[in-house]
Swiss-Prot record:
The lineage of its organism: Bacteria, Pseudomonadati, Campylobacterota, Epsilonproteobacteria, Campylobacterales. This is Glutamyl-tRNA reductase. CDD domains: NAD_bind_Glutamyl_tRNA_reduct. Substrate binds at residues 58-61, 121, 126-128, 132. It is an enzyme of class 1 (oxidoreductase). Possesses an unusual extended V-shaped dimeric structure with each monomer consisting of three distinct domains arranged along a curved 'spinal' alpha-helix. The N-terminal catalytic domain specifically recognizes the glutamate moiety of the substrate. The second domain is the NADPH-binding domain, and the third C-terminal domain is responsible for dimerization. Belongs to the glutamyl-tRNA reductase family. NADP(+) binds at residues 203-208.
Length: 449
C-alpha cells in the first residue's frame, strides 16, 4: 500500500525475549510511574521530530511506539532513541543496536497489532499483554505524551486484539507465564511426591494475582506477602475459595522464606527482595519461580534451591506455540487485514477529503434543484449560468465557518468522532462513521456491538 504524505508516520523500536536476554531486559525495564514519566520527558526534550510517544515495558519486552513529524527520518530517530536509552540505562549503543527491531509505517502498525493480539508473546494467546498496553497508553495519554495519532493506533489495536481472541479461540486455554509456572510447579510436586500443596507468593500485582488464581485451581494453599492488606481484602473477594489464601506483611519475609518448598515472586521492585543472607539450610528441596523483570530473587548459594526465571520457562512454552499454530496463522490473517483497514479508516477521517465531499454534496444538491427549476420553467434558460454562480457563492458562504472549524479541530483527539459524526449526518460514509461512534477516547477501548 502506498501511503499518502498527509498520513501519520508510525514508528516502533522493540527489544523482546526473542532478541535480548533476561539480564539486558532487566536493565531496560521501567517499573515506576515517576521513572517512566522522566524517560518520556527526556525523549520529548531531545527528539523534536517525535510528535507522540509511549513506552511498553513488561517482563518480556521493552518497546517504544511513536508518531513522527512529516519529513522526519526513521533511522535518525532510532539513533537518537538508542543514545538516550544507552545513557539512561548505562548500556552501550552497540549492544542495543544488535538487539533492536525498528518498524515504520505499515510494518509498525502491523507490529503493534501483533503485540496487542499476543502473537508476539512468549506465551502465544496470553491476554495480560492487552491490559499492559492499555495501561501504557493511558499513562502516556494522561501525561500528554501522546494524542491523536497514538490514540487512533491503540484503539484500533485493541479492536484487532478482541477480534483475534473471538475468531480464533487462541486465548481459550488461558495460558500465560503465570499458568506455565504453576503447571511446572505442579509437575515438580508430582515427580517429587510432595503432598503438602502450599506455596509462598511474594507480591500482589497483576502477575502475582494470576499466580494465586492458578494455584487455587490446582488445589494449592497460598500465603501472600505484600504491603497493602486492603488490596488483599479486595482481591480475595474475587476468589471462589478465599479461605485457602492468607496474608502477611512483607516485612515478615525472614520468618517464612525458609518454611516453604514452593515460592513465586512477582513484584515491581528494581532490587532483589529475596537475598542469600536470608537463607538457611533445610532438609527439603525448594523450588522458586522468579517471574519479575528485573529479577526479585538473588541467585541462591544453597544447592537444594532450584530457581526458575522467566527465560527458563521458554522450553515449556514451545509446546504451547506448536499447539496453536493453526490459530496463529488465522490470527495473522486478521492482523494483516486490520492493518489495511486501519489505513483506510485513517484516510476516511482526514479533514480535507471531508471538506471536499461537503462542497461536492452542496454543488450536486444546488445543481439538481436548478435543473428542476429550469425544467419547470421557473427561471429562463439564459439565466442558468448566473444562477449557478449565485448558488456556488451561497454554499461557499454557508460552508465557510464549518470549514474553518473543521481545520481548527483537525489536530485534537476528538476530531475522529467529530468527522465520523459529520459523515454520518450527511450520509457520506456510514462505515467510517460507525467506527467513530464506537470509539471511546477516554477508556481506550471499543464498545462491543
Amino acid at each position: 500500500m502506498e501511503l499518502e504524505t498527509h498520513l501519520s508516520k508510525y514508528f516502533t523500536l522493540a527489544f523482546t525475549h526473542k532478541s535480548m536476554g533476561l539480564e539486558m531486559r532487566e536493565k531496560l525495564a521501567i517499573n515506576s510511574s515517576a521513572t517512566l514519566k522522566e524517560f518520556l520527558q527526556t525523549i520529548k526534550n531531545h527528539c523534536p521530530n517525535i510528535k507522540e510517544c509511549m513506552v511498553l515495558s513488561t517482563c518480556n519486552r521493552f518497546e517504544i511506539y511513536a508518531s513522527l513529524k512529516h519529513g522526519a527520518h526513521a533511522n535518525e530517530q532510532k539513533s537518537a532513541l538508542l543514545k538516550i536509552l544507552a545513557q539512561n540505562k548505562k548500556m552501550s549503543v552497540s549492544d542495543l543496536e544488535k538487539c533492536v527491531l525498528m518498524s515504520v509505517d505499515e510494518s509498525a502498525v502491523h507490529h503493534v497489532f501483533s503485540v496487542c493480539s499476543s502473537l508476539d508473546s512468549l506465551v502465544v494467546g496470553e491476554t495480560q499483554i492487552t491490559g499492559q498496553m492499555k495501561n501504557a497508553y493511558k499513562f502516556a495519554f494522561e501525561e500528554k505524551f501522546c494524542s491523536k495519532d497514538l490514540t487512533r493506533l491503540l484503539h484500533f489495536a485493541f479492536k484487532c486484539a478482541a477480534k483475534v481472541r473471538n475468531l480464533t479461540g487462541i486465548s481459550k486455554q488461558g495460558v500465560s507465564i503465570s499458568s506455565v509456572a504453576v503447571k511446572e510447579a505442579l509437575n515438580i510436586f508430582e515427580k517429587e511426591r510432595i503432598k503438602d500443596k502450599k506455596a509462598l507468593v511474594i507480591g500482589l500485582g497483576e502477575m502475582a494475582q494470576l499466580v494465586i488464581k492458578h494455584l487455587l485451581n490446582k488445589q494449592f494453599e497460598a500465603l501472600i506477602l505484600g504491603r497493602n492488606e486492603a488490596k488483599f481484602e479486595d482481591f480475595i473477594k474475587e476468589l471462589e475459595e478465599p479461605k485457602k489464601v492468607s496474608f502477611q506483611n512483607i516485612e515478615n519475609l525472614n520468618a517464612y522464606i525458609n518454611e516453604y518448598q514452593l515460592l513465586f515472586c512477582a513484584t515491581s521492585s528494581p532490587h532483589f527482595i529475596v537475598q542469600n543472607d536470608m537463607l538457611k539450610e533445610t532438609i527439603f528441596r525448594r523450588f522458586w519461580f522468579d517471574l519479575a523483570v528485573p529479577r526479585n530473587i538473588e541467585k541462591p548459594v544453597l544447592d537444594n534451591i532450584f530457581l526458575y526465571s522467566v527465560d527458563d520457562l521458554e522450553p515449556m512454552v514451545r509446546e504451547n506455540v506448536e499447539n496453536r499454530q493453526e490459530s496463529r496463522t488465522k490470527a495473522y490473517e486478521i492482523v494483516g487485514l486490520a492493518t489495511m483497514e486501519f489505513y483506510q479508516w485513517i484516510q476516511s477521517l482526514e479533514v480535507e477529503p471531508l471538506i471536499k465531499d461537503l462542497r461536492e454534496l452542496a454543488r450536486i444538491s444546488a445543481q439538481k434543484e436548478l435543473q428542476k427549476a429550469l425544467k419547470k420553467r421557473y427561471v429562463p434558460k439564459e439565466y442558468e449560468s448566473n444562477i449557478e454562480k449565485i448558488l456556488h457563492n451561497a454554499f461557499n458562504t454557508f460552508l465557510h465557518h464549518p470549514t474553518i472549524a473543521l481545520k481548527k479541530n483537525a489536530q485534537k483527539e476528538e476530531s475522529d468522532v467529530l468527522v465520523g459524526a459529520i459523515k454520518n449526518l450527511f450520509n457520506l460514509d456510514k462505515s467510517s462513521a460507525n467506527h467513530a461512534q464506537n470509539l471511546n477516547l477516554y477508556k481506550c477501548e471499543y464498545y462491543e456491538e
